[in-house]
Amino acid sequence: MATVQPIVNSHLSELDEDVFHHFGFTTKSFDFKEKFGDVKFVCVCGSSGRIHNFAISMAKLAGLALPVENIAGSHARFVLYKVDHILFADHGIGIPSTLILMHEVTKLLYYAGCKDVLFIRLGTSDGLGVKPGTIVLSDRCVNTKLEPYNELCILGKPVRRQTKVDSNAVNELKKLSENLSLKCSVVVGGTITANDFYEELGRLNGSICTFSKEEKLAFLQSVYDHGIRNMEMEGAAITSHCNLTGHRAILVCVTVVNRLETDEVTTSTDEFKLFEQLPGQLVGEYLKRNNGIIVR
């Protein structure tokens, strides 16, 4: 259960119609409680194609007819699918895009009357000291200063929001992984959420680099020694927003490079596609066992 009293935006009650600009619908498009009132889980990832494929796999597992309907409008920024008690959406790259999605999905859940929903990010990430193709279950999410906060600037003032993950769900997933025949390793560790792919993640191969190779390696080794096992760019947006809106969140990411060895993602296209599917194999079984779908 979520432990923080959720914040409700009182201004929403003043709206005759709330426009979900990035989903391409409004509160008058359909009855939110009827359409979404049974949602227990929200699965998100960066790519619209990847989340579509995961929604299809869950629909097949549930014995539902295909295709799955994209509920979002034809000119929407994001996609949105629903299979039984699960919503599926893409969040794009980085905190700004992800926060836009989080605002609109959590408003959707508010209008639908859904509480204590578990958000699951299925993503790709840089690994630290683990080989490519390893699933990292995040036991904490921190910024590049190793602080458990997502930092924003609202009306010119700095705001810090906690990035707590649902430790119970993390433990359940880890235990489940030990009983499945997954073709990968699953580890529990800390996750860094950075603001970009190059400089904040300590890469030497961006168009700008103001640090040496030695400084980079010292930083990466330091965060590894603090228990960090992967780095990405969205988790803090998801966890912090869930903490404020009365929901829970976990991060399930597969590593595509070991940053203690190289900056470059050199996996082949076929190997990368295989890696992308690994989080869904674990999460899909978890959703099935926790009544996310109804097997027909």
UniProtKB/Swiss-Prot annotation:
**GO CC, any one term:** cytosol
Primary gene name: UPPB
Name one molecular function that GO assigns to this entry. Answer: identical protein binding
Q: Which GO terms describe its biological process?
A: nucleoside metabolic process; nucleotide catabolic process
CDD domains attached to this UniProt entry: UP_hUPP-like
Name the domain of life this protein comes from: Eukaryota
Query: What SUPFAM superfamilies does the record tag this protein with?
Result: Purine and uridine phosphorylases (SSF53167)
Matches recorded under InterPro entries: Nucleoside_phosphorylase_d, Nucleoside_phosphorylase_sf, Uridine_phosphorylase_euk
Which family is this protein grouped under? Belongs to the PNP/UDP phosphorylase family.
The name of this protein is: Inactive uridine phosphorylase B
Q: How does it assemble?
A: Homodimer.
